[in-house]
Structure formats: structure tokens, C-alpha cells
Amino acid sequence: MAIQTDGIVLRNKTIKSIKSIYFLLEIDCPSIANETKPGQFVMLRTSDDNHPLLRRPFSVCKSYSTLHPRKGKRGHLLILYKKVGKGTQKMSTFKEGQEVNLIGPLGNGFILPPLPSSTPTILIGGGMGMASLSALGETLGSGELYVFIGGKTKDDILCGDDFPKGKVFIATEDGSRGKKGTVVGLFLSEIERFDRGRPHHVYICGPEGMVKSLSKVLKSKKWIVQVSLEARMGCGFGACWGCVVKTKNTEMVYQRVCKDGPVFPLSEIVWE
């Protein structure tokens, strides 16, 4: 159940380089960290002066509960964000010890493969989509894991070191790291190694164009594919209906990314 509460900033640092636009925000917030599942998100107030007025949604990159602490962290949330507008500009000035207000955990997260599982797992992410996949990676068992990461340049490759148990494939559009091209093209070049009649669990998060392309590639596969959708959100809990997506099951319906998602079966998304 989502709650509104204050957390304390533990660190707020750039990653990649000192001039990077990517930041990692660590917050001491046990009441939310204890309940967060991979794929869920929080709505964070980025300023005290209501400029901007609306909260901003952020996937939880890591959550360390008080019952299951890891790496010396207990009750902490990690949020990966990119400085792109007024809200994230103000976030980049958060100082250690500062109070921040959050609502969470929100949305429906990923459905995990049953454990133990011999079914291979594939993660495919682009850009900031790697945040929710990083959270997922820490919860998977010891089965086969393949991770495909894409970005425009080497500076846009995020969370590449977060999957020590998996085989990581990287693509950049300018060829500055890994294979030159898109992550979809990279996945297509490797798909034969997976296409052996076995079922697979596939998890996707990234830009809409990437997800659309993967939908075409995977629609003929009898794989279990889940996608975490990115969307602009007004409220974060379904009241404003500002983040709807058309889906199909037995009939066409509009569902709210914030409330009914952000994770959906890929086969249910209707692309227009």
C-alpha cells in the first residue's frame, strides 16, 4: 500500500563523470523501501516552493529493506535520474541530510519467474529504462540471465555493472561502446542463441520506439514477455487518467500506466 512520507537524502551524486547529467539519489526511507517490489515507482516532490507544482515519477533502482539489508544498506531507496528539466534540475541540488517528500511504492511491478527456474531470463533496456531492470536483476535466482543494454553513446550506458551473474551485451548508436547500432539490432543478432524451442522470461523497459520494435520481433515467440512502460504522469495513482495506454485482452480498453501498470504483458499493448 502506498504512503506519503518524508525521507532523508543520504547522497546525491553524478555518475559517469563530474559533468554527467545522470545522478544517483539515495534516500533513507524504510517505510517505502520495506514494501517496494521491482518495477514499482515513487512520486517525488522536487521542491518546497511548488515550482514545479506536480511531483515527478521515478522508478526505484534499488530498495534495501530493514528485514533484508544488503551491502550495509538498510531501509534505503536508490533513484537513478537524468537532469533534463526544472524538476530534475532542482533534484540535482539536494544535499545530504535534506528532507524529501515521497509517495510510494506505486504501480504494479514485475511478476518474477518461479524459483528455482531453469527458464532463461532476458532483460532488454534502453537509457533510463535500465533503472527498473537493475532492481529486477537483484531479485532473480541463479538461472541463465542475459542482459541487453542500449544507449546513444557510452555515457548513456547505465547499470552495466549491476548484473554480475548475467551475460551483458551492449550497443551504442555511435559505436563508442559495445556494438554499433541499437539495442534492438543487437538483440536480433543474438536471438538465435535463445530460439531453441525453450520458453523464456523477457523483461523490457525503455523508449517507446524500442519497445514497439521489440513487440514486432517477439510477437511470434511463445515467451513470457513483460514491459514496463514510460509515461508522463500527473498524479501517480490513477485519479487524473493522464497516462492511459490502449490495451487488449478480450476487448479493447484504456488502462492507466501509473495504476494498472507500469508493467504489462507486452502482448496486451496496442500500438497506434
Where are these regions (language model features)?
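Ferredoxin-reductase
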Residues: 2-96
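A general structural signal for well-ordered alpha-helical segments in protein cores
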Residues: 36-39, 57, 77, 133, ...
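A charged, well-structured terminal subsegment
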Residues: 251, 264-272
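FNR/FR-type flavoprotein reductase catalytic core
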Residues: 66-68, 73, 86-232
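Local cysteine-cluster metal-coordination motifs and their immediate loop/turn environment
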Residues: 132, 208-209, 230-262
